[in-house]
Amino acid sequence: MEESQGYLELDKSRQHDFLYPLIFQEYIYVLAHDHGLNRSILLENLGSDNKFSSLIVKRLITRMYQQNRLIISANDSNQNPFLGHNKDLYSQMISEGFAVIVEIPFPLRLVSSLERKEIVKSHNLRSIHSVFPFLEDKFLHLNYVSDILIPHPIHLEILVQTLRYWVKDASSLHLLRFFLYEYRNWNSLINPKKSIFVFSKRNQRLFLFLYNSHVYEYESVFVFLRNQSSHLRSTSSGALLERIYFYGKIKHLVEAFANDFQASPWLFKDPFVHYVRYQGKSILASKGTPLLMNKWKYYLVNFWQCHFYVWSQPVRIYINQLSNHSFYFLGYLSSVGLNPSVVRNQMLENSFIIDNAIKKFDIIVPIIPLIGSLAKAKFCNVLGHPISKPARADSSDSDIIDRFVRICRNLSHYHSGSSKKKSLYRIKYILRLSCARTLARKHKSPVRAFLKRLGSELLEEFLTEEEQVLSLIVPASSTSRRLYRGRIWYLDIICINDLANHE
């Protein structure tokens, strides 16, 4: 029992009190803005003579040392003596700088945890594709899946309160709270009319950190309750006594939460429950019955509302049967179908025909969302008809081709695990023809005449990139390289980029 209580209590090793001095170091804010991505660093608004400078950081740090300036002006927030007139710029600098500082302890904890578990190549765990082999292995044996839209906190103060378990330094938390409340526009970043947490692009790093910290807190308790009840399956006398001891723990944990809602210990005893999360969506799959899945649904809703002060409703959790439902996750439509096969068995003079159905985990590329992304980025219209890119018509031919080839390569790279490639081939066709239309528009030539003059060079550019990716899996001497249709999961993909943001 003491072990369970110790887990739910604050781990002293998770507290850090060295963060506040780092806030007053100028290089932290320079580091936060300079990631080698060819973007603006610290842009000081000096009229037409804009320039990059760290002097603005120095001025901001000097004001931060003057503690008597840290007073929230309730009457005139736009003319606060601390933030001055450059509120947007200062707030962005503080948010990104603070995010860099508070992220420091987490990589250290992750590395130490992986070293204890002797996990090699831990960077592979960051890959988005590392989730799909797990789904292929586990979901074949499950019956129901719940699509969960994770609720967001109803107030920013909840995010700060969650962080206090990780950061012992009260000064850092007070400073964070000051900027969250002073920069009132940030409150509008959380849109209650939408079903997921909406972040500002300008301050995305800090809000992602606060949100993930909040989600991690309730996931840790949720996973702990789940694990304590399902890892003992033996019926031997020794294990039976230990199992009774664990059921006693579960009973005590349920009593600890009984003040807010009723829960039953048998809810946690299903050994075939799997949980996967990415950003604002998670999936809970089980081999249990619809009744058990509904129990999980209402348990999660009460768990969020009563213990983590986030508002949620049961309608945000959709329960479907895996055999007749496809769930959208990480850019794929996934489902578990039956692959029929017929086996002929000969026994002496008698023969038998056996119909056998084997479960198969299908992962396909959803064509409609991809066409929508291409239409948003002006590669085609909403019907999927390729169009030219006038914004790039002033670039050189090689730059235009390289850009289209890079996008085509990235899409092929990410969707290489698809069971059916037909949809992906259509996307490649749209990009190739859009590239040809862009080049023809630049040279003021009809597309057909331009392609005839260019020959097969344009097509070879796209095929060359595809061959480079495929050569990692199929040897160059293999005659089946062009016919290879197997799934390929890459462990170097750590993010999904919107095509519209990479013009």
Swiss-Prot record:
Pfam entry (one): Intron_maturas2
Major localisation: plastid
Keywords, ordered alphabetically: Chloroplast, mRNA processing, Plastid, RNA-binding, tRNA processing
GO molecular function: RNA binding
Record carries keyword Membrane: no
Family: Belongs to the intron maturase 2 family. MatK subfamily.
Name of the featured protein: Maturase K
Native organism: Liquidambar formosana
